[in-house]
């Protein structure tokens, strides 16, 4: 996949990642770009015209540097602490924001259903600001089957659930977050241990999934912050 921009590339390198090739816009210079090139002398670099660079980049603002990398593989590690199950989340901005917050609060694992947006797409990577590199993410998962394998409670975020703020969350727990339009699927709701909701004032039916995810994750962090490593 492609990492667009020196900040994202720098974050990837700091996480221990290896760059395969670099693509540089001949018309753009910066200290940050030059430092990345200088620190990676063995990486092949393609210097191309601006008109070609903008065709490769998906971003509206040109960054000047793109890196080609292999998508990191995640070996399965038995989940513990807080895990997220993401059900059919399509918006790359929401998905990237959720992953960024998950890394910030020390989430152990993120499992994504087959219908979720590609977490390694340029827009999702941009939204996460490279948080992918510090998390264990599993794509293309059958969440219904996965729930049956978990040895701890699985909570689903749902409007008809019990208040999140009245809940003593388990130390080891998975929380399901549903798609922007439909929420958590009926099959996953039926398989969940408990349904929880975020209290809201009258007239507001739901929150953006990214905002809801942040509230849930930070409530877990609040309850267990002395035990969470960030």
Outline where the language-model segments fall.
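N-terminal positively charged helical leader segments and presequences
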Residues: 1-58, 229-230
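Amphipathic alpha-helical repeat scaffolds
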Residues: 5, 91-94, 98, 207-212
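RNA substrate-binding interface of SAM-dependent RNA methyltransferases
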Residues: 14, 68, 76-162
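Short, acidic/turn-prone active-site loops that include or flank metal/cofactor-
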Residues: 27-28, 50-52, 115-117, 180-182, ...
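Short, hinge-like loop/turn segments at secondary-structure boundaries
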Residues: 38-40, 65, 127-131, 172-175
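Structured adenosyl-cofactor binding patch, chiefly the S-adenosyl-L-methionine
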Residues: 103-105, 116-119, 124-133, 186-230
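Active-site/ligand-binding-proximal alpha/beta "capping" segment
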Residues: 155-204
């Amino acid at each position: 996949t492609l990492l667009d921009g020196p900040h994202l590339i720098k974050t990837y390198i700091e996480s221990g990642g290896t760059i395969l090739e670099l693509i540089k816009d001949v018309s753009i210079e910066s200290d940050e770009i030059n430092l990345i090139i200088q620190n990676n002398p063995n990486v092949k670099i393609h210097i191309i015209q601006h008109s070609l660079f903008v065709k490769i980049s998906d971003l509206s603002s040109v960054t000047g540097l793109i890196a080609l990398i292999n998508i990191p593989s995640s070996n399965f590690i038995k989940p513990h602490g807080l895990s997220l199950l993401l059900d059919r989340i399509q918006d790359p901005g929401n998905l990237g924001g959720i992953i960024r917050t998950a890394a910030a609060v020390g989430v152990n694992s993120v499992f994504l259903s087959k219908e979720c947006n590609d977490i390694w797409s340029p827009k999702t990577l941009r939204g996460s600001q490279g948080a992918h590199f510090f998390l264990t993410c599993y794509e293309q998962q059958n969440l219904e089957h996965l729930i049956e394998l978990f040895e701890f409670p699985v909570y689903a975020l749902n409007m008809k659930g019990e208040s999140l703020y009245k809940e003593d969350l388990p130390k080891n727990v998975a929380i399901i977050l549903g798609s922007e339009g439909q929420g958590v699927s009926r099959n996953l709701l039926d398989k969940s241990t408990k349904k929880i909701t975020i209290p809201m004032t009258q007239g507001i039916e739901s929150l953006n999934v990214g905002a809801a995810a942040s509230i849930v994750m930070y409530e877990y962090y609040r309850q267990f912050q002395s035990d969470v490593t960030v």
